[in-house]
Structure formats: C-alpha cells, structure tokens
From Swiss-Prot:
Its EC number is 6.1.1.4. One of its GO terms (biological process) is leucyl-tRNA aminoacylation. GO terms for cellular component: cytosol. A motif ('KMSKS' region) lies at residues 609-613. Belongs to the class-I aminoacyl-tRNA synthetase family. The gene is leuS. InterPro entries: aa-tRNA-synth_I_CS (IPR001412), aa-tRNA-synth_Ia (IPR002300), Leu-tRNA-ligase (IPR002302), Leu_tRNA-synth_edit (IPR025709), M/V/L/I-tRNA-synth_anticd-bd (IPR013155), Methionyl/Leucyl_tRNA_Synth (IPR015413), Rossmann-like_a/b/a_fold (IPR014729), tRNAsynth_Ia_anticodon-bd (IPR009080). Its main location: cytoplasm. It catalyses: tRNA(Leu) + L-leucine + ATP = L-leucyl-tRNA(Leu) + AMP + diphosphate. SUPFAM superfamilies: Anticodon-binding domain of a subclass of class I aminoacyl-tRNA synthetases, Nucleotidylyl transferase, ValRS/IleRS/LeuRS editing domain. This is Leucine--tRNA ligase. It comes from Lactococcus lactis subsp. cremoris (strain MG1363). A motif ('HIGH' region) lies at residues 40-51.
Length: 829
C-alpha cells in the first residue's frame, strides 16, 4: 500500500507550526547545539534541488540532537541585499524591496514544504532596518578602531554593473563573477576594511577549528604569509632608491635586473627621455587589466625598459630596471629583484627580452629551463656551498649588518574593498563635513535607513544612486556646518559576516545580542554550506568575529567550530564533439542515443552543474508534489557521501520512495507484539548503534542503508516487537519526519515524536547467540542448520549427523570433520 504523501505532509507541517514544535529550547540544564545553514540569497528562481541537500543535513542533526536532550538552535534567514535584486529592479522598473519580499515568501513556502525544523521566530533579513542597524553599528566600531578607512585606490571597476568589486569577485579570466563583464582598473575613493591587521590571527586560529583541511589550506593561501627580507636598491646616477621584498634574499647574487609595477611612484622619475613614450603606452595598457589577468602564470610576459639601472647592493653590479604588469603595486613594495635562473616568471621574462640568466644554486641547466629546487649555492661569494635555509639566514645577517635590508614578514592578503556604488545595500553611516572632517553616526542615530526611490540607476559619476537624493544626502549640523552623507553602500558580504549572532537574540533593540545568550550559544557547533564560500564569506565572518571579540561583544575567538561542505547535485547535460554543453531542450533521444535536434550530431551525456541556460534545473516543488518531501530528503541523503558531487537521478528518487513505502507496509502489516521472541535482537540493536554512530559522523547514506537492512530483516521475521517498531520509527524520523510522525501515532503513541528520548542499544545483544552452519557429505552440501554459537566439537558432530540421518542410512561413516561455527563434513563409503 502506498501512503498519501501530500495529505500526510500537510497534516504534520500544520501540527508543527500550530504547536511551535521547533521553538528553541531554553532549559539551562540541557547542553546546547547550534546548527547553522549558510543562509540563501532569495533569487527570483527560487530553490533548486541543490539547496535542500545542506538544509536536510542540518535538519537531520537538529532533530537527532533534540531527541538526545539538547537545546537546539536551528534558524533560517535571508541574505537579501545585493546586485541581482537591483539589476532586476532596473530592468523591470520594480522596487527591489518588493521583489525581495516576494522572493522570500516563495523561498519560505518551498523550505516549509520540505519539513525542515527551523525556528521561524528567529528569522532574520539583512535588508530589515532592525537588522542592519547592527551591521551599521559594527561599521562604526570598525571606524572608531581605525579598521575602516577611506583611500584612493585602484579598484576593479565594472562599467556594466556601475560599481567596483573586490579582488575576490574577479574571475581568473579577468571578468566579474556576477555577469561575466569586463573588469578594468580605475583609481577611486573607497572605503577599506583593515583585515590585514588580523592576518596573523586569522592564520593561527585555523588550528582551533574542525574544518576540512582543503578549506583551511585555501584560507592559508589567500592570507599568503611570506617570511623574507626587505632590500634597498639604489638607482644608478641618482639619489633615488626603491625597496624590494623577497622571500629568497640568498639569491641576491643572481639578481640580474629589477622590475617595477607600472603604477610604482618611481617610474616617471627614473624613465629616460628615449623610453618615455614606450613606458607611457605600456602603463596605459596595463591599467586596463585586472590583477588576476596580470598575474596569470600562463600569459606571455610583457614589459618596457625604463632606461635606468639599479645597483645590486650585495655585489655592486648594475641591473637594468624594467616595468612589467606581472608585478603588482599592491604586493610587497610593487618592485621585484629578478633572479631568472631560479624563478619561473623572471626566467620567461628574461628569455623574451634577452636578459642575463646567472645561476646561484647548483643543479639544472638554466639556459634550457628554470631551476627551482634546493642545492648548494654557487657564484655567491660568502654563501657558496650553503643550502637554502642556511644561506637565507646568512644573507639576512649580511643585509642587516650593512643596513641595506632587514628581515620582514608580508601577507598576500589585501585590505577588504568595502564600498559599492549601488543603491541596494546598507548605507554607510558616515557624514563628510565641508571643513574636511568626517564623523560616524552615533548608536542612537542608527539605523540610517535606506531611502525609498524609484531612481536607482548608477549615477554615472562613480557615486551610487544615493547621490541623486539631495533631501537625504545633505545635512546641516546644529552649529550650521554643512555636510553630505556617504553615498557608497556596503557590499553583500556585510550582513552575512555577522548574521549568525543575531539569530541568538533576533529581537533585541538595545544591543546586537544579549552577552549572556552569546555566551550560552557560541560557537556555532556545525555550519553547513558550499565550498565556494571558502575564502570570501568565511574569512570576512572570521575577521568581524575577531573584531567583536576584541571589543568584548562575543566570548569566543572563532565563530564556527565545525564546518562541513556539502557536494554539488549535478544535472543531466549533453556535450558535442568539441566538449561544448548543449541545452536539454535542444536534445532528442532516439535509437538508444542522444542527438542535437538542429544539427543531428550525436551527443555524449554527462553530468554538469545545474543551470537555467542548460535547462537542467530540477525544481523541488515538482519532486515534493509527485514523490513527497520525505522521499526527496531520503534520496538526497542516500545519493552518496554528503561531501561528494553526484548526478541527479529519477531512478534513485523512485528507490527512496519504495523504501519509505516498504517501511510503511512493515508497520502496517507486521504482526506487532508487546513481547519479544529475540529473533530481531541483534539486527535491531545493530541498527540503533550504527545509525547513532553514523549520524554523529554525518555518514547519512550508510545510516539509511542500515535502516533498509532492518526493514529486510523484519520482513523475514515472524513478529515485530512493539519496542523495536517504535525504535525504528524514531531512527527514521530525522530523515523522513512526516511519515515517522504518522507511523508513531499509528503505533499507539501520543502525537509528536520530536522530543521523545533517542533509542539506546544493548551491547550484549550485538553478539549473535546462534550461527548457521553447513552440513556436507563427502564435501557436498546437504543441509544448513541454525545452532547455538561455540558448541563443542562432539556436540557439533552429533547435531550434524542427526540433521542428515536419512541420507546416511546404509552408509559406512569413515570420519566426521567438525569446524566450530562453520561446518560439519561427514566422509562416507
């Protein structure tokens, strides 16, 4: 019998809402568990089946922990500021706030249809002034501490978006992450956050959290700590000098030329008249490229000679000074000493321009290829014969003694570009006065509410559309001094850098959150979301958390104790002979193959990321309607390991539904008895043990496998003890909560399974008391019998002979071989 999922799911969702079943527990005597999802941006497209994978995982853990007696905080909210809503509003003439509210309502409907146990009383929305009051408050604290400052910086400007974007939002091909538009470098007044002040702590404290090693490594690389030396180079024939940071001061004897970034302050001053034109043209071209495009290792090296020379401080040799875009003004000092024999980029550059390549580490033929391994130093006077570590130490000693350099630690991490020239974001709570000073708004002036306007097109001047709203923009102080509000808004990352704190105390109008409640709930016990947020969101949130820790606002150094990245659910896609993806509506299936409708070309079927353009997005609404939410939940958890990327499959969905149908039939059709005859003892206790252990490890797929094993065992058993029927339904409940609630009541229990104590197992019943042995005559199988475990040989022989007594009639038994717990073989003549 199939159950009616639509009726059952609607019934229990109403029950949970009416009874506020998932309201966060506040019993001080219970341990706490804070399960957090990366909150979504509520797009117009709604949820796709990839979203619920992570949400189901945290929901399973939340339901499991409630049953284990924990106070569980499991909230949901909306990361609702950002470019897409604004872009949509500009394209359609709609208000981004209205569009966002509609999208949130749709997301919420979809999320509720999946039976997630969120405490909706804690819902947050980054665009709500009661929320962003505290985003702005954090900004004022950063400003007071000197961690938010204005600077004229070369930004990644995207003309089509009318805004600057952060380095992290530029793709490797030099286009914008959002929209894929060209990115150019342009100097602008910007707000910056001094994340570099926290570089060392952001690095060190990674040791304190239980995160995937791959994510930690990505953060380490992004922070990019380098230990080396600053070295001073004088420009020959002038009183000018420049500094270079190098991680390899031991290779100074091999430095044969120097390279300055095109933006370096010295370039104009040292370029000779003959080279002026070439250098100016080179700098113009470089300004059109993004940092990522400039540092792409695979691109051809380009440069321009300045006509000037530097003096190598270690041996007095003259070195030509070049300008090249592979050197960034923002890294080190915007200048490098080039050691082409032992650095890939320097070697390629030297080969293009015919510059000297002098080996200073033994090994390899540097005319043929760069040599980057270790080895004894050569051509290096007092460093000859030393290995890398010894030579670095000695070189730094020499530089410091001669006062031409010193030991230095640098970081690849840059300060965070925090302003956007757009309307749909948090206003930055700063006023610029006509006397040249700026002040932050005080707490009682917050929130500075984003004014409602239909004119949200970028101003075209590089300012945000807020610059057009003079009533809002212009202010006058009590003493008559005039001022202008800051027109830049915050990036979408602002609200998501602290939202997890607001869930703890979402309605507090006096503080970001009650310190006692923060003490009670922090850190987050499990944070689940996509690995694509490894650098941006997770690094920014850790930075803000550390600032708040220093301010005494939060009690922990780190926000998220354990992080888990779910894999991606891939859609069906098709590729042509060039490997190009073809949209599913352009594909026909015939003769057992797939063909392009327009060209007739045979196509290869292969999984790929779900996308609107490929028309392979699966909408969870359709799945819930046809199969039910419980089926979708079980299927997504059973597909494979939670962190693996796996293709979507209708067959897998049907398999999950069949399992639930079998579980329902098992409860409805089994002979359920109050007494226990012991035949299911082992499999039941194994099931409780395995499911419990696997939930702790987040091995949800193998936990479901164990539930399937139990159902199979019950179908072969004579009867199902009531205790085991109840226990099974409890184990099923985190995965398939609607049907579990229904079966729980069917078994005669009071409605509401969420807080019933989690089943326990009896260790002694995990040991099999019986074994099945085979009985053979002359090596041929004659019988299989169940006997008590560990019987003595004599007893085993006796039972074996009795079980095949008929076959032995008239035969002469020569000998009996008995192997305890395995077999009895009777040799006859």
């Amino acid at each position: 019998m199939e159950y009616n999922h639509q009726k059952i799911e609607a019934k229990w969702q109403k029950y949970w809402a009416d009874n506020k079943t998932f309201r966060t527990g506040t019993d001080k005597n219970k341990p706490k568990f804070y399960a957090l999802d990366m909150f979504p941006y509520p797009s117009g497209a709604g949820l796709h089946v990839g979203h619920p994978e992570g949400y189901t995982a945290t929901d399973i853990l939340s339901r499991y922990k409630r049953a284990q007696g924990f106070n569980v905080l499991h909230p949901m909210g909306w990361d609702a500021f950002g470019l897409p809503a604004e872009q949509y509003a500009m394209d359609t003439g709609n208000d981004p706030a209205e569009f966002t509210a509609e999208n949130i309502a749709n997301f919420k409907r979809q999320i509720n249809s999946l039976g997630f146990s969120y405490d909706w009383e804690r819902e947050v929305n980054t665009t709500d002034p009661n929320f962003y009051k505290w985003t702005q408050w954090i900004f004022t604290k950063l400003y007071e501490k000197g961690l938010a400052y204005e600077a004229e910086v070369a930004v990644n400007w995207v003309e089509e978006l009318g805004t600057a974007i952060a380095n992290e939002e530029v793709l490797p091909d030099g286009t914008s992450e959002r929209g894929g538009y060209p990115v150019v470098r342009k100097p602008m007044r910007q707000w910056m956050l001094k994340i570099t002040a926290y570089a060392e702590r952001l690095l060190e404290d990674l040791e304190e959290v239980d995160w995937p090693e791959s994510i930690k490594e990505m953060q380490r690389n992004w922070i990019g700590k380098s230990v080396g030396a600053d070295v001073t180079f004088e420009v020959a024939g002038t009183d000018k000098s420049f500094e270079v940071f190098t991680t390899r001061p031991d290779t100074l004897f091999g430095a044969t030329y120097a390279v300055l970034a095109p933006e370096h302050d010295l370039v104009d001053a040292i370029t000779t008249p003959e080279q002026k034109e070439a250098v100016a043209e080179y700098r113009r071209k470089a300004s059109l490229k993004s940092d990522l495009a400039r540092t792409d290792l695979s691109k051809e090296k380009t440069g321009a000679f300045t006509g000037a020379y530097a003096i190598n401080p270690i041996n007095g040799r003259k070195m030509p000074i070049w300008v090249a875009d592979y050197v960034l003004a923002s890294y080190g000092h915007g200048a490098v000493m080039a050691v082409p024999a032992h650095d890939e980029r320097d070697w390629e550059f030297a080969k293009v321009y015919g510059l000297e390549i002098l080996p200073v580490v033994e090994g390899g033929n540097v005319e043929e290829a760069v040599y980057t391994e270790d080895g004894p130093h050569i051509n290096s006077e007092f460093l000859n014969g030393l290995d890398k570590a010894q030579a670095i130490e000695k070189a730094i000693e020499f530089l410091e003694e001669k006062k031409i350099g010193k030991k230095k630690i640098t970081y690849r991490l840059r300060d965070w570009l925090f302003s956007r020239q757009r309307y749909w974001g948090e206003p930055i709570p700063i006023i610029h006065w006509e006397d040249g000073t700026s002040t932050a708004l005080s707490e009682d002036e917050l929130p500075l509410v984003l004014p409602v306007t239909s004119d949200i097109k970028p101003s075209g001047t590089g300012e945000s559309p807020l610059a057009n709203l003079t009533d809002w923009l212009e202010v006058t102080r009590a003493d008559g001094l005039k001022g202008r509000r800051e027109t830049n808004t915050m990036p979408q990352w602002a609200g998501s850098s602290w939202y997890y704190l607001r869930y703890i105390d979402p309605n507090n109008s006096e503080a970001l959150a009650d310190p006692e409640l923060l003490k009670e709930w922090l850190p987050v016990d499990i944070y689940v979301g996509g690995a694509e947020h490894a650098v941006l969101h997770l690094l920014y949130a850790r930075f803000w958390h550390k600032v708040l820790y220093d301010l005494g606002v939060v009690p922990t150094k780190e926000p998220f104790q354990k992080l888990f990245n779910q894999g991606m659910i891939l859609g069906t896609s098709y590729r042509d002979h060039r490997g190009a993806l073809v949209a599913t509506d352009k594909v026909e299936k015939r003769d057992g193959g797939f063909y392009h409708m327009e060209t007739g070309e045979a196509l290869e079927q292969a999984p790929a990321k779900m996308s609107k353009s490929l028309k392979n997005v699966v909408n969870p609404d359709d799945v819930v309607e046809h199969y039910g939410a419980d089926t979708l939940r079980v299927y997504e958890m059973f597909m494979g390991p939670l962190d693996a990327s796996i293709p979507w499959s209708e067959e897998g969905l049907e398999g999950a539904r069949k399992f639930l149908d079998r579980a329902v039939r098992m409860i409805e059709n089994s002979e359920i008895k109050a007494e226990n005859n012991g035949e299911l003892d082992k499999v039941y206790n194994e099931t409780v043990k395995n499911v419990t252990e696997r939930l702790d490890l987040m091995y949800f797929n193998t936990a479901i496998s164990q539930l399937m094993i139990f159902v199979n065992a019950v179908n072969k058993a004579k009867a199902l003890p009531l205790e085991y029927a109840n226990g099974f339904v409890q184990l099923l409940a985190p995965f398939a909560p609607h049907i579990a609630e229904e079966l729980w009541v069917k078994l005669g229990n009071e409605a509401g399974i969420s807080y019933v104590a989690w089943p326990t197992f009896d260790e002694s019943k995990l040991i099999e008391s019986e074994v099945e042995i085979v009985v053979q005559i002359n090596g041929k199988l004659k019988a299989k019998i169940k006997i008590a475990k560990d019987l003595a040989r004599e007893e085993l022989e006796k039972i074996g002979r009795e079980s095949v007594a008929e076959a032995l009639e008239g035969k002469n038994v020569v000998k009996v071989i008995a192997v305890p717990n395995k077999l009895v073989n009777i040799v006859v003549k």
